[in-house]
Amino acid sequence: MATSSSDRWPIPLKQHIPTLIFITVTVLTSNLVSRTQPTAYLDEIFHIPQAQQFCSALSSTSLFSAQQVWRQLTSVRYDAQLTTPPGMYAISVGMAKVLPGWECKDVVWLRSTNLVLLLTLPVLVARILGQIEEQARIASAAEDYSPSKTITQNLGKEITRHEIEMLQAKAKLQLPPTPSASHDDLAHIEPPTISIAQAALPAPTGSAAPLLRALKQREASAYTMALACTICFLPPLWFFGFLYYTDLASTWLVLAMLSLYNDLNTSNAHVAPTITGLLIALTSILAVAVRQTNIVWIGFAAAQATLSRVGKHVSHTQQGSDPVTQAIGMVKGAFGDNKKGWWTAVAINAAPMVPVLAVCVLFLRWNGSIVLGEKAAHQVALHLPQMGYFVAFALGFGLFPLLFSLQSMSHKAQDQGPSSSTLATFTHSVRSAVSALIDSTIASPGCILALAAALAGFYIAVDRFTIEHAYMLADNRHYTFYIWRKYRSSYAIPALDGMTIEPKLAVVPLFALALIAWSRALTHHAVNKRTGALFSLLFWMATAAVLVPTPLIEPRYFLMAYLLLRIYSHPYAPCEKQEKSAQLKWIYLALEAATYAAVNVITVGLFVNRPFQWPSHAVDVSRNEHTTMRFLW
């Protein structure tokens, strides 16, 4: 097999180059933002003073003394304007206790809480990407496995380097046959036959695999790290890593909990399931303490882990491509021959949620609402257009990942010859993506019906359920203020006298097509194909549960849903397909990174170089708010 130039001339630790670039750019930008805006800005005027109170109260208190900690916490007056619990402040206090020299009373140090979380986020994302890729590889091998298919029966088939390495690793775990006294001619002893699928499956419990080999297998590739860093470079997410907002802490904890759920459902995990379950419970409680709506994402993580695990008990004859058929297969699995394994999987994934659910019930009973503080400005509403705004946000920032995902589903994706130029390969892949989208919308009566339902649903949503929040209409520091002014206006069509067009209705087809495209990508690239449609439905239900009750439109609210959409819609193809599309996946990733870089340069440039003034009567002088304002998400 031909060896790539990178294999002939390897770069030492090349998988860490994307991380080093990400860290360098992030730290330099953080320093620039702090020098430009050294005082608390916008929501920081609420968060920073509150965090400073907790830091002062616990500065000389040992965290191991629960009684002293509780006494000091109850002495702190909580700001009535804050609508989120004090989880982020607990993280800052914890860092001040653990890290030497850390001062959590200063603005720069408090902002560094999010900076630390942002710098470590690519490692966490890469871990999740690796877990999903491993699950997809095992699921693909299990789907293709047949006892009659062995390596000796497929000598004419090209075997990739990765498959050879898997076979070698598996063969080292097999004991060689021991010759008897009457059969001491080793030439007549046939070696054990191992199929590719068997090599892909986890090693049996108790196998003594060397530690170094296990660590090497867990090491992320250069592409995985580049992908993780690019995902964390998402402009709204990356920007709020430089301010003291709750978004980074919320995102980090939800992803950590998701990674732990993946560990809980891995047969070859290195940590006992009981310990993993306890870690999930603690992480979930802290995630809800940072932002209340994270309870939805905790439920999503538990449900998707359960779905992936119990999907293995669904037989091939019960699987289908629509959620109804898959749901019927799941119900049959719950009461079929494998019902014990089915309910065991449900119990394993539901148990870690019990503590956080108990905490949430106590909180609701004490507070009377999911919102803390100023409840009047955050009333629950039926804001159905939020789903349209989200898919538009996802399409804007995820256009190239979506195209890459769609083109991999098309049968035309691999038609180009190996000698094609880079531009020709990319152009062909875009055509394949468009072809896949067309197939998803008009290829069958069911697809046409789904498109019609999406169009009708979004039209009713934007026509009858559009909400204009007072904060969005009055605060000219946010980009949504300027976008909404264009969105809510009517524009006359010069060629048609007297006719106007409303942008909110004109974008309805875009909303519908984006929803169908992302749903198709989620379903097709689900780890377990037998439950892919159910997984897609589960994701959209969780997203709606978070966004629809929210009357305010903010890109920050879309971050968690988009990160999960980006991670789970990525093509985790078998290794041979990855080798054929290696060039293409780097092209799409480079385009995504370039888009993010351009947006980040513009937004940071506006924040630093384009300040503007508010009148003194419009600022909160009691909170030391300054009249100099800056643009941000």
Curated annotation (Swiss-Prot):
Q: Which GO terms describe its biological process?
A: dolichol-linked oligosaccharide biosynthetic process; protein N-linked glycosylation
Query: Which compartment or compartments is the protein found in?
Result: Endoplasmic reticulum membrane
Keywords in alphabetical order, please: Endoplasmic reticulum, Glycoprotein, Glycosyltransferase, Membrane, Transferase, Transmembrane, Transmembrane helix
Query: Transmembrane stretches, by residue range?
Result: 9-29, 112-132, 192-212, 225-245, 270-290, 344-364, 384-404, 442-462, 498-518, 533-553, 587-607
Identify the Pfam families for this entry: DIE2_ALG10
Q: Could you cite one Gene Ontology molecular function of this protein?
A: dolichyl pyrophosphate Glc2Man9GlcNAc2 alpha-1,2-glucosyltransferase activity
Q: Which residues are glycosylated?
A: N265, N367
Q: Write out the GO cellular component annotations.
A: endoplasmic reticulum; endoplasmic reticulum membrane
User: Pathway involvement?
Assistant: Protein modification; protein glycosylation
What's its catalytic activity? an alpha-D-Glc-(1->3)-alpha-D-Glc-(1->3)-alpha-D-Man-(1->2)-alpha-D-Man-(1->2)-alpha-D-Man-(1->3)-[alpha-D-Man-(1->2)-alpha-D-Man-(1->3)-[alpha-D-Man-(1->2)-alpha-D-Man-(1->6)]-alpha-D-Man-(1->6)]-beta-D-Man-(1->4)-beta-D-GlcNAc-(1->4)-alpha-D-GlcNAc-diphospho-di-trans,poly-cis-dolichol + a di-trans,poly-cis-dolichyl beta-D-glucosyl phosphate = a alpha-D-Glc-(1->2)-alpha-D-Glc-(1->3)-alpha-D-Glc-(1->3)-alpha-D-Man-(1->2)-alpha-D-Man-(1->2)-alpha-D-Man-(1->3)-[alpha-D-Man-(1->2)-alpha-D-Man-(1->3)-[alpha-D-Man-(1->2)-alpha-D-Man-(1->6)]-alpha-D-Man-(1->6)]-beta-D-Man-(1->4)-beta-D-GlcNAc-(1->4)-alpha-D-GlcNAc-diphospho-di-trans,poly-cis-dolichol + a di-trans,poly-cis-dolichyl phosphate + H(+)
Query: Chief location of this protein?
Result: endoplasmic reticulum
Give membrane topology per the record.
Multi-pass membrane protein
Using the UniProt record, name the top-level EC class of this enzyme in a single word. transferase
EC number(s) stated in the UniProt entry for this protein: 2.4.1.256
Name the InterPro entries on file.
Alg10
Function summary? Dol-P-Glc:Glc(2)Man(9)GlcNAc(2)-PP-Dol alpha-1,2-glucosyltransferase that operates in the biosynthetic pathway of dolichol-linked oligosaccharides, the glycan precursors employed in protein asparagine (N)-glycosylation. The assembly of dolichol-linked oligosaccharides begins on the cytosolic side of the endoplasmic reticulum membrane and finishes in its lumen. The sequential addition of sugars to dolichol pyrophosphate produces dolichol-linked oligosaccharides containing fourteen sugars, including two GlcNAcs, nine mannoses and three glucoses.
Homology family? Belongs to the ALG10 glucosyltransferase family.
Its protein name is: Dol-P-Glc:Glc(2)Man(9)GlcNAc(2)-PP-Dol alpha-1,2-glucosyltransferase
- Tell me what gene encodes this: ALG10
